[in-house]
Regions:
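Short acidic/polar alpha-helix capping motifs at helix-coil junctions
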Residues: 4-6, 72-77, 143-146
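Active-site metal-binding motif and surrounding structural segment of the metallo-beta-lactamase
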Residues: 1-5, 82-94
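Active-site neighborhood of phospho(di)ester-bond hydrolases with catalytic His/Asp-centered motifs
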Residues: 1, 50-53, 70-71, 92-98, ...
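Active-site-proximal segments of metal-dependent phosphoesterases and phosphodiesterases across multiple
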Residues: 65-75, 86, 92-114
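Binuclear metal-ion centers of metallo-dependent hydrolases, dominated by the metallo-beta-lactamase
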Residues: 10-19, 101, 105-159
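Core dinuclear metal-dependent hydrolase active-site scaffold
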Residues: 11-89, 152-159
């Protein structure tokens, strides 16, 4: 597998949920995901940056049973609860706002900004439906969170 190929390379660190890495420049805490992989909190130069990966309230209410929706929500909220033991505030959060979920596509993102003090929210997993991601801006504002949309290759933001 590609992971096996990378394992022999220098300067590569693998983290599972609950593990961390720290050197003289940064600290990385790995949290869980409700799909593949893990999510990360990176702390460097006094700033905290959260990359959700595939952590989200992944349910398709339009297609799922009530039990499946409940299970997805419980798994997601359990991970947020676990994260709150470590995370107090987040300067920048990159988080899925995925319209494929149907009518509740912003639910996980809203739950996230509702649980954590997030300075800046950067949506991801939205391409090519940019306008759906933009719909989260007023929700972020309601929680006192700046909304920044990076929708083109090379877009950047200074934090």
């Amino acid at each position: 597998s590609s992971l096996d190929e990378l394992s022999g390379l220098p300067n590569i660190v693998y983290l599972d949920r609950g593990e961390s890495y720290e050197d003289d420049r940064l600290r990385v805490n790995a949290f869980g995901s409700t799909d593949m992989g893990v999510s990360y909190l990176v702390t460097a130069e006094g700033k905290t940056i959260f990359h959700a990966g595939d952590l989200n309230n992944w349910h398709w209410r339009d297609e799922s049973t009530e039990e499946e929706v409940r299970e997805a929500e419980t798994a997601y909220l359990s991970e947020l609860y676990y994260m709150k033991r470590t995370i107090k505030s987040i300067d920048v959060a990159m988080f899925p706002v995925d319209a494929r979920l149907g009518k509740d596509y912003m639910r996980g993102a809203e739950q996230f900004v509702g649980e954590f003090n997030v300075g800046m929210f950067v949506p991801m997993h939205f391409y090519p439906v940019v306008r759906k991601a933009e719909s989260f801006a007023p929700i972020a504002k309601r929680y006192g969170t700046e909304f920044v949309l990076l929708s083109s290759t090379g877009d950047s933001v200074i934090i």
